[in-house]
Amino acid sequence: MSDLGDVFDAGRDEFAVLGPVLWNPIGEATVAEAGLRPGERVLDVCCGAGSSAIPAARAVGSDGHVDAIDLAERLLEQGRANARDLPQLTFTHADATRWDTTGYDVVQCVFGVFFLPDMDAASARLAGLAKPGGRFVVTTWGEHAIWPVPEILGDAVVAEGGAPQASPGRGPGERICTPDKLRGWLTGLGLEDVRVVTFEHSMPLDDTTSWAIVMGSAMRMRLKGLPESLLPKVRARFVDLLRDRKVDRMNAVSLIGIGRTAE
C-alpha cells in the first residue's frame, strides 16, 4: 500500500482544497451515523488528513481516544496541524494490515477498504480489532458517484497525446457500491445488526476543484508517466471537456455501513 500513500502525499495540497467541499462533510456524516459517545475508543483507518478522525475525537471527548492511521505522512502532518486542540487524537504513520491494537469501541474506515490489498481478509481483520459488541463502520462511494469524471480525464489525457487505457472500472469498490451489496458484504464479514445509510452529496466542479479531485485522489495515478510539461495541457483540456459536456458538479453520493461484532 506504500505506493498509494505516495500518491496521496503528492496530492496533499489538492486534498486540502477538497476537504471543506468533499471529505469533511462525508467524514462528519460517518461519525454521526456511527453514534460515537463520550469516552469511547476509536480506530480510524486510512484517515488521510482527519476528515472523520477529527469529528470522531470531538464526539468521544477528552475521556475517549482516537487512533488515526494512514500511509500518507504528509496528510498525517496536515491532520496533526488541524487537531492541535484535540489531545485525545493521535495520528500515526502505519499500515492498516499490520495494526494490532484491539478492544476498540468503533473501527471506522472512510473511502479506504477498497484500497486494501485483500479487501475481504483485511476488513475482517480490522473488524476483529473492535471489542465484542463493538461497531465496524465503512463508508464507500455509491454506485453512480464520481463518474463520468474519470472517463473525461482519460479523454483529456488521450487528446493531449497520452496513451489510452482500458476503463479501470471500480475495482473492489464495485462489490460494495449499493446498499444491498454493502449490507451483504458486511454481513459476510460476520457482523450483526447491519444497517446502511445513503448520504446524498455533490461537489461543484470549477477550475480549481475539478483539478483538485484529479490530483488529490487516486485519479492522480492516471497521470503517472506523463511528462510534467504535458500536465497543464491535460488540465486545460479536462476543464474544457467538463464544460463542453455540461458536467459542473460531481456526484459524491456515499454509503455508510455499520455493523456490530459478535458479543
Locations of the language-model features?
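Conserved Class I S-adenosyl-L-methionine
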Residues: 3-11, 22-23, 49-51, 171-263
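A short acidic, Gly/Pro-enriched loop at the edge of an enzyme's catalytic core
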Residues: 97-107
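A short SAM/SAH-binding and catalytic strip from SAM-dependent methyltransferases
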Residues: 105-120, 142
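A short glycine-rich, Lys/Arg-flanked "PGG" loop and its adjoining helix->strand segment in the class I
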Residues: 120-135
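Conserved class I S-adenosyl-L-methionine
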Residues: 137-163
